[in-house]
């Protein structure tokens, strides 16, 4: 099976391509490794598809941050870009075995229930999540042509994540033995999942050729920012003072996001074991320690 991964140079993309190639069951192409794919340019999309002729596509490429604060760009890349990709797939008759599109858990927004299941009505609160919600509607339009599964990952953690993200930033501060750290809302609760587990789950979904489903990638367990801080204190055996900075508190912050993994476990099997948050943090801490000692 020939698999094309869009967004192959990103955090999850790099890890996924590595895992799939390691399995030696697939011929794997990264759309940003072999050739750059501009999702906003239909000709660029078609060029990559014509050259790779994939049997299956994992669509990871997305814009998660806009430096110039222009929200239109989110929709051009995440929504219209997905339209360009899916239309080209049908026109060129590729990816006959299916497509797996990455959405985001952020589309749930603020809900009344503790565990967020796929059956809930999305209530996205920012343009990134809104653009992904629109993307899911685009996917529905093409499900009569291809088997397309949408995954909604919660907070993915692990090696290779940008240091500007919250947890890698905290890990780095503990490795450097900083005396203080500036944080925003300490009570925000998130469902953290290992990038290795995330990629393993994608591999299993591809292998099973799951079609036309929407599935959370989550553990069902939530940790607050303060709990992550406490775990890092234990791992590093270092105490640090927290200074809360209101500038780090997002106006659209969702207080709690914990996924319901029931549907995922129905596919994987109820005996599937997720990597613990402590184990993820320990690996990140040790790796950062090595990086800074070189």
From Swiss-Prot:
Residues bound to substrate: 104, 128, 155, 190
EC number: 1.1.1.135
Residues that coordinate or bind NAD(+): 11-12, 38-39, 60-64, 104, 128, 132, 154
Entries under Pfam families matching the protein: Epimerase
Residues annotated as the enzyme's active site: 128
Keyword Amino-acid biosynthesis tagged: no
InterPro entries documented for this protein: Epimerase_deHydtase, NAD(P)-bd_dom_sf
Matches recorded under PANTHER family: DTDP-D-GLUCOSE 4,6-DEHYDRATASE-RELATED
Protein name as catalogued: GDP-6-deoxy-D-talose 4-dehydrogenase
């Amino acid at each position: 099976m020939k698999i094309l991964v869009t967004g192959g140079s990103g955090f999850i993309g790099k890890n996924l391509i590595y895992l799939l190639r390691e399995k030696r069951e697939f011929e794997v192409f990264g759309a940003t490794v072999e050739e750059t794919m501009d999702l906003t340019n239909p000709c660029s999309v078609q060029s990559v598809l014509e050259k790779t002729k994939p049997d299956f596509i994992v669509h990871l490429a997305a814009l998660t941050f806009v430096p110039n604060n222009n929200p239109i760009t989110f929709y051009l890349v995440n929504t219209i870009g997905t339209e360009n990709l899916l239309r080209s797939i049908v026109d060129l008759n590729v990816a006959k075995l299916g497509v797996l599109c990455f959405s985001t858990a952020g589309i749930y927004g603020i809900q009344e229930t503790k565990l967020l299941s796929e059956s809930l009505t999305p209530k996205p609160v920012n343009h990134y999540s809104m653009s992904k919600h629109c993307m899911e509607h685009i996917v529905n339009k093409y499900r009569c042509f291809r088997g397309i599964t949408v995954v909604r990952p919660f907070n993915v953690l692990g090696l290779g994540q940008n240091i500007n993200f919250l947890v890698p930033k905290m890990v780095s501060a503990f490795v450097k033995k900083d005396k203080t750290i500036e944080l925003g809302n300490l009570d925000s609760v998130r469902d953290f999942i290992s990038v290795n587990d995330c990629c393993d789950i994608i591999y299993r979904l591809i292998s099973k050729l799951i079609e036309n489903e929407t599935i959370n990638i989550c553990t069902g367990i939530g940790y607050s920012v303060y709990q992550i801080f406490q775990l890092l204190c234990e791992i590093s055996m270092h105490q640090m003072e927290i200074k809360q900075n209101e500038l780090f508190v997002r106006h659209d912050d969702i207080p709690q996001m914990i996924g319901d993994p029931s549907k995922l476990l129905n596919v994987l099997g109820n005996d599937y074991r997720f990597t613990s948050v402590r184990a993820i943090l320990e690996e990140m801490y040790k790796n950062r320690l090595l990086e800074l000692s070189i």
